[in-house]
Amino acid sequence: MKSLVKAKKEPGIWMQDVPVPEYGVNDVLIKIKRTAICGTDIHIYSWDEWAQATIPVPMTVGHEFYGEIVEVGKEVQGLKVGQRVSGEGHITCGFCRNCRAGKRHLCRNTLGVGVNRPGCFAEYLALPATNVIALPDNITEEQAAILDPFGNAAHCALAFDVVGEDVLITGAGPIGIMAAAIVRHIGARHVVITDVNDHRLELARQMGVSRAVNVKYQKLSDVANELGMLEGFDVGLEMSGNPMALNDMMKAMNHGGHVALLGIPPQETPIDWNQVIFKGLVIKGIYGREMFETWYKMIAMLQSGLNISPVITHNFPVDEYQHAFQIMASGQSGKVILNW
């Protein structure tokens, strides 16, 4: 089958023919229809320090997908051939304390599809049935292809109560933009998003934010004053991994504020702990999606009218994957979809 493979320990992705994956008695085989390129895939494509330390070569990459079930393992229940599906890309062990307690997103033995095991940038994907999400008919193929990153956004945006609250989002990548749409949809008052990328800030404006702020030219304190905010932000969602953005958020938070951290800053990032301690900030790390409450909530939000379509900016046939990766890496895009 056709597959996009990290075939060499150097920058790039290569299209190769690989065997159709075998599937076990508790797995399903999925015919891939659409995939989306993630920031993780760009790290692998660029072959940065994280990728070099993490990715076995060769490896079929990718973990964001929509497809249809074509084969079902003999022990699988509740799924059938022909169903429209997406899937959870974190494969958990099922035996650790957190898995047994129903907190699979905290499994210490998690394996990533397209990172530690063959991914979805291929004509077929084998996936444990417990990770497969059957889709309602009113979820489109494009929406289904980006449910994984939408789930990151939902996990972060739903970490704290945002109804009537003022929310600051640092980082206007696709996940940050979708988080902005979520908190607006569920009742936040002011939603401010920051970045230095004007293209992505414009996408955020299309998603209904109160202010999309280029911090190269405008101060957060000035924006807060314009909005009539006298006490700072109630909830912060840090999506960028940028040390300056992280510390700007801490300064902008109200006393007793809540901060969810999804972006991964460099290990040596200094933090002004005085802001955290004397303001009594509550900080929560966010990784992946809650299994499977986040999936339920995000599909329900789409069904209730949440529109995330503006974040999808490019569609390419899979044979144009090199151009698609270059566009995604440029930062001048939202989500980029490959059609198989």
UniProtKB/Swiss-Prot annotation:
<dbReference type="Pfam" id="PF08240">
    <property type="entry name" value="ADH_N"/>
</dbReference>
<comment type="function">
    <text>Catalyzes the NAD(+)-dependent oxidation of L-threonine to 2-amino-3-ketobutyrate.</text>
</comment>
<dbReference type="InterPro" id="IPR004627">
    <property type="entry name" value="L-Threonine_3-DHase"/>
</dbReference>
<protein>
    <recommendedName>
        <fullName>L-threonine 3-dehydrogenase</fullName>
        <ecNumber>1.1.1.103</ecNumber>
    </recommendedName>
</protein>
<feature type="binding site">
    <location>
        <position position="107"/>
    </location>
    <ligand>
        <name>Zn(2+) 2</name>
    </ligand>
</feature>
<dbReference type="InterPro" id="IPR036291">
    <property type="entry name" value="NAD(P)-bd_dom_sf"/>
</dbReference>
<comment type="subunit">
    <text>Homotetramer.</text>
</comment>
<dbReference type="GO" id="GO:0008270">
    <property type="term" value="F:zinc ion binding"/>
</dbReference>
<feature type="binding site">
    <location>
        <position position="93"/>
    </location>
    <ligand>
        <name>Zn(2+) 2</name>
    </ligand>
</feature>
<keyword id="KW-0520">NAD</keyword>
<feature type="binding site">
    <location>
        <position position="175"/>
    </location>
    <ligand>
        <name>NAD(+)</name>
    </ligand>
</feature>
<feature type="site" description="Important for catalytic activity for the proton relay mechanism but does not participate directly in the coordination of zinc atom">
    <location>
        <position position="148"/>
    </location>
</feature>
<feature type="binding site">
    <location>
        <position position="200"/>
    </location>
    <ligand>
        <name>NAD(+)</name>
    </ligand>
</feature>
<feature type="binding site">
    <location>
        <position position="63"/>
    </location>
    <ligand>
        <name>Zn(2+) 1</name>
    </ligand>
</feature>
<dbReference type="InterPro" id="IPR002328">
    <property type="entry name" value="ADH_Zn_CS"/>
</dbReference>
<keyword id="KW-0862">Zinc</keyword>
<keyword id="KW-0560">Oxidoreductase</keyword>
<feature type="active site" description="Charge relay system">
    <location>
        <position position="43"/>
    </location>
</feature>
<feature type="binding site">
    <location>
        <position position="96"/>
    </location>
    <ligand>
        <name>Zn(2+) 2</name>
    </ligand>
</feature>
<dbReference type="GO" id="GO:0019518">
    <property type="term" value="P:L-threonine catabolic process to glycine"/>
</dbReference>
<feature type="binding site">
    <location>
        <position position="99"/>
    </location>
    <ligand>
        <name>Zn(2+) 2</name>
    </ligand>
</feature>
<feature type="active site" description="Charge relay system">
    <location>
        <position position="40"/>
    </location>
</feature>
<comment type="pathway">
    <text>Amino-acid degradation; L-threonine degradation via oxydo-reductase pathway; glycine from L-threonine: step 1/2.</text>
</comment>
<dbReference type="GO" id="GO:0005737">
    <property type="term" value="C:cytoplasm"/>
</dbReference>
<feature type="binding site">
    <location>
        <begin position="286"/>
        <end position="287"/>
    </location>
    <ligand>
        <name>NAD(+)</name>
    </ligand>
</feature>
<keyword id="KW-0963">Cytoplasm</keyword>
<dbReference type="InterPro" id="IPR050129">
    <property type="entry name" value="Zn_alcohol_dh"/>
</dbReference>
<dbReference type="InterPro" id="IPR011032">
    <property type="entry name" value="GroES-like_sf"/>
</dbReference>
<dbReference type="InterPro" id="IPR013154">
    <property type="entry name" value="ADH-like_N"/>
</dbReference>
<dbReference type="InterPro" id="IPR020843">
    <property type="entry name" value="PKS_ER"/>
</dbReference>
<dbReference type="InterPro" id="IPR013149">
    <property type="entry name" value="ADH-like_C"/>
</dbReference>
<dbReference type="Pfam" id="PF00107">
    <property type="entry name" value="ADH_zinc_N"/>
</dbReference>
<comment type="similarity">
    <text>Belongs to the zinc-containing alcohol dehydrogenase family.</text>
</comment>
<feature type="binding site">
    <location>
        <position position="195"/>
    </location>
    <ligand>
        <name>NAD(+)</name>
    </ligand>
</feature>
<dbReference type="GO" id="GO:0008743">
    <property type="term" value="F:L-threonine 3-dehydrogenase activity"/>
</dbReference>
<feature type="binding site">
    <location>
        <begin position="262"/>
        <end position="264"/>
    </location>
    <ligand>
        <name>NAD(+)</name>
    </ligand>
</feature>
<keyword id="KW-0479">Metal-binding</keyword>
<feature type="binding site">
    <location>
        <position position="64"/>
    </location>
    <ligand>
        <name>Zn(2+) 1</name>
    </ligand>
</feature>
<feature type="binding site">
    <location>
        <position position="38"/>
    </location>
    <ligand>
        <name>Zn(2+) 1</name>
    </ligand>
</feature>
